[in-house]
Amino acid sequence: MYFQLPIERMARHREMPSQIDFAREALLALEEPDYARFEPTERGLAMFAASEEDLERPVATLQRLYGEAVDLRPPRVRCLPGHPLQQPVMAFEVAVPREHSLAVRQELRQRDARIEEEYQRRRTCVFRGIAPLRDLLGLGGRLAALSRGTSRHAMRLSHYAP
């Protein structure tokens, strides 16, 4: 199940009747890195990754190869089955120019992130903490908008929790 890869994204071909044939064809064009896995399924190509950013390169490759014919579903958080259901919790680090730190702190709090450490290095403010992955989806794009493209961030799976 790739427990270490808590994000899934499906790719389908709008014009091919057999999604598994599309997935097998697409798989030949993709280089599988250490931080992602790709599987052909009856629903299309399943792509599993450690973070949204880890899927950017394969998504760009599929868009370049298939253009408008490829249907990319939004990223989905993968939980561990059982009672109770276990969801992925991510450790994150965000570095942003000091002038954008208030907006970024507010964004992290709105996402129910637990900021465990905050410090400044020269003109950069760094936030470290944890949050459920479901609350962090889309964070990269939002940080780029808040900081005019000057932020950096990284996430990794910390653990699973109910």
PLM segments and residue spans:
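Accessory interaction regions appended to the cores of large information-processing enzymes
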Residues: 1-162
